[in-house]
Amino acid sequence: MASESSQSSSPSSSQPPSSVPSPSPGNNVGDTFIGSFISLISKYEIRYEGILYHLNVQDSTLGLKNVRSCGTEGRKKDGPQIPPCDKVYDYILFRGSDIKDLQVNPSPSAQSRQEIQSEQDVNQSPHSRPAMTMSSPISGYDSGYGLGRGSQWINTPALSSKPVPVTQHSSVPLSFQPPSANAGSLTESPVSLIDSTQSNAGSSMPIPSFVQGNKFASSGVPLGMMQKPVSSSSTIPNGPQIIDYFSSPIMGLVDDSSQVVTRSPDVSSNQSYSSNPSPLGQTQLHTPPGLASVSSNLSPPSEAQLSAPNIQKIYPSAPQAIGKVVYDPQSNHPHRSIPHELPAVASNSAPVIPGPLSKSPESFFDMDPSLQSRQQMVYRGQEMFAATNPASANVPSQSFAPRNHAPLLPLPVSAHQSRIPSSSIEYTEEFDFEAMNEKFKKSELWGYLGRNNQRNQNDYGEETAIEPNAEGKPAYNKDDFFDTISCNQLDRVARSGQQHNQFPEHMRQVPEAFGNNFQRPPPLQPGQGAYLAAQTNYRGGYHNNNNNNYYSNSGYGYYSGGRGRGRNTHF
């Protein structure tokens, strides 16, 4: 049988099953608590959790099984805290004297456990549902890509061979791929499907980007290129977008190959699209929205001039600069995808735009192939972006400037450099200290300060030395100064009754040493307060009249001997 140890405050190891106390008999009062979850705190502030299986009221003992120690949990005031233990004990028998606090929590029933398990399954169901395939017709399913008519896309190999997982929070199939090689087997055109989807789902529904023709059938376009939604804003109307996937070095401007670069159609914002699909072998003229005013003044080319074979004959391998719209790959919401105009290079099937945007093939690849690095391509992309800007549409075309060209305007001068004069003084020789010492008139300086004899020149140019003052005051006399004011002789004289005869002499010595303002009266006998008040300015106002060569003092004095008021003159 195991019990809690008073020294280590930890339960002992489990004993053999033979010594385990049997459950309480049926007539015991505590049978109703058998099987309850017990949380008790021992007298050593350690909390234990377990299931009650034995309770004896007569012996004041209880037994727990599957017991786990939770430690002191900060309740212990003296000594170190005991951390919780992960070990689960088979059983522990507690005495009533070892228990400080006890709480009974009824054990959950089997029905409540099933309800908790079912709630957990419901919460995890969106992440664990099996994947659904598009090989069977689905009624009422709309993924946002115009697949509301699932029966019309059943025969498409690109959709029937790819499983599409469907979750609760996402309405877009993750492995959607538009048809490439077998595009002719579609029962309905993609444009009509988009129009029908938009009429049902609204203008905020994302639109897939389809590929005209089968020129990407053998190129192996990555799947991530076909999953980017197109923003449906007022500046870019909803309609079929054509993907330009090319291998020009200028693609270094776009991070990774997962970016989708699309061209906006050549129509103004107040025009509408027609739902008729365009032929697969025909290419249309596309212009950025910012150049609508420029392209409106130009005569539209004929279909024969815009056909792919004619363009390939004129420029078999020269890409053209066309304004692109790159959408944010991190945003899957149509309202969060903000278009950014970025220069790019169209493929061979892109048309030639007349005007300032049309460049000769030699202007792009006029340098040595070894010099066409990534940085040079970025620099050329910036020049092409400036060419596609509407503000610079009327500027005549110019050849690209070299990378290391001089600035057109002088660089601004900082405030620190503007205070520095332009003509700097250059010192070619060292500083001559001896010559500077000769120029320095040390005698005049020291004579002015009184530390040397000042030499003056008379009217005839002769120098005369001024003799020092012979009537200078001598040094102090020790007997007359320090000994008179620093000893206690005056106190002894006052106590012996001789102070009245020596007081006038003392009053003459004190003003000579400290002046009249620093006089301090000596200790007096009783009855001499009036005399001291008449002779000193202690606590009195001072008045001096230099014209009459006299000064007068007046004041009040309060001493132990009496009170007096007087007025005196210089003596």
From Swiss-Prot:
Residues 1-27, 102-141, 159-187, 258-305 are annotated as: Disordered. Belongs to the LSM14 family. A motif (FFD box) lies at residues 474-489. A motif (TFG box) lies at residues 498-518. GO terms for cellular component: P-body. GO terms for biological process: deadenylation-independent decapping of nuclear-transcribed mRNA; mRNA processing; negative regulation of translation; positive regulation of cytoplasmic mRNA processing body assembly. It comes from Arabidopsis thaliana. CDD domains: LSm14_N (cd01736). It comes from the Eukaryota. The gene is DCP5-L. GO terms for molecular function: protein homodimerization activity; RNA binding. This is Decapping 5-like protein.
